Each structure stands twice: as C-alpha cells, then as structure tokens.
C-alpha cells in the first residue's frame, strides 16, 4: 500500500493535481466521504486497502487453485468492505470472508489453543517479510509518515529522525507540512 500511495502522491504532486491527497484504509471513513463529502472523492487516494491488495495478490498468485481467502481484521466495517462490488474480480470476491480479531480470539479460546505451548515457527515465505513502514502503518499518522519516508528514498538518518520527531503520528492537533 505504501509503495502505491507514495507513487500516487508523487504523480499528483508532479502533475499539479489538487492537494491534499486523503488516504484511509477504513471503509467507514471512505463511505462517509462518498456520502457526506463527495466533492472530496477526487482527492481520495485510489489505492486499495491492504486487505484489498492482499486479496487481489492471493487471487492472482493462486488463480488456478480453489482458494478460500479469509482476512483477519480489527473492525466489523471490513466485512462491509469485502462485500463491495468494486472488490470483485471476474465475479468473485477478492476476500471470501472477514473475521474480526475478537471472533478469531473466541474461536482460538473455544478450540483450546494455547500459543505459549506451541513450538516456535518462522513466517511463511514469500509473504512473511515485513518492513519498518508496515510497523508504523497502523497508528494515526503512520501512513503519512511511511509515505514521506518512501518519497524521500535515500534520505539521511538525521532527516528520517526529524520526520519521526516532528509529530506526524499521534492524535494531538492538526499536522501541516510543506512539500517541495
């Protein structure tokens, strides 16, 4: 998602498109903008949510296999997102089922699984790799910081530290940045 949103932001910036570019992987927020502020939709990122992108990747990677795709998500609004017609390819949903983390937790408890007693294991390849951008992605302002870091590319560690310290992440106040 960060790679796509960074490229989209740079394209908008370089083409003189109207800014700011709004982004959210929250389907509730997207639906709110669609219904209450439709005039802002041209400024909303066209990138899919991580769930949508993973669903598309799975469908493409395993297109010749009978795969049932399940996403584990923190919010029930993701169930709505998965049911949107835009999240279908060739008449099939990109994600077949969404379980909330609460539902999964209940299932684990009912099955009597004790993670502390399970043997250690490594993530599956090739999708078990992760980046620092993904770590900050899930906090308020994390996507913005990850996009800034990506756009800056090979910036010095001091520059990246300055970005982290300037308060992109967090709930305090409105954040404003000049991009040149």
Question: Which stretches of residues belong to each language-model region?
Answer:
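Iron-sulfur-associated redox domains of electron-transfer enzymes in respiratory
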Residues: 1-180
